[in-house]
């Protein structure tokens, strides 16, 4: 879903109108323009998804910088715990998540997922 949100943000940034965003999505993902039926259906789909996402609360994601591990001591059999620092997440910049974007962008992300999951994309890719 991260890649679909990234594509949706690009579509929103590069095109203002929904029809243009759908056209650009087809060009980027499938290498062709949508026909009029596809464009009309996908405009309705994105608008329906925008309404759906307005009603849904997307969870926010956080990344830990430390975790607690529990182990068993090899010779005595006693359990012990220690805190492990995860330096990889200290300066980590994650992709935008659903809870960080607008319902419209999530609707565009659904369009991107739809295209990414099409047989035509698998063939082009």
Regions flagged by a language model, labelled:
Residues 1-125:
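Substrate/cofactor-recognition hotspot
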């Amino acid at each position: 879903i991260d890649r679909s949100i990234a594509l949706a943000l690009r579509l929103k940034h590069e095109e203002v109108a929904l029809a243009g965003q759908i056209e650009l999505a087809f060009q980027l993902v499938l290498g062709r323009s949508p026909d009029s039926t596809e464009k009309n259906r996908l405009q309705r789909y994105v608008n329906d998804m925008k309404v759906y996402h307005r009603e849904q609360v997307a969870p926010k994601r956080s990344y830990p910088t430390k975790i607690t591990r529990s182990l068993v001591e090899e010779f005595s059999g006693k359990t012990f715990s220690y805190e492990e620092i995860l330096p990889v997440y200290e300066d980590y910049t994650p992709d935008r998540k659903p809870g960080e974007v607008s319902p419209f962008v999530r609707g565009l992300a659904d369009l991107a997922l739809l295209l990414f999951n099409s047989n035509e994309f698998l063939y082009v890719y």
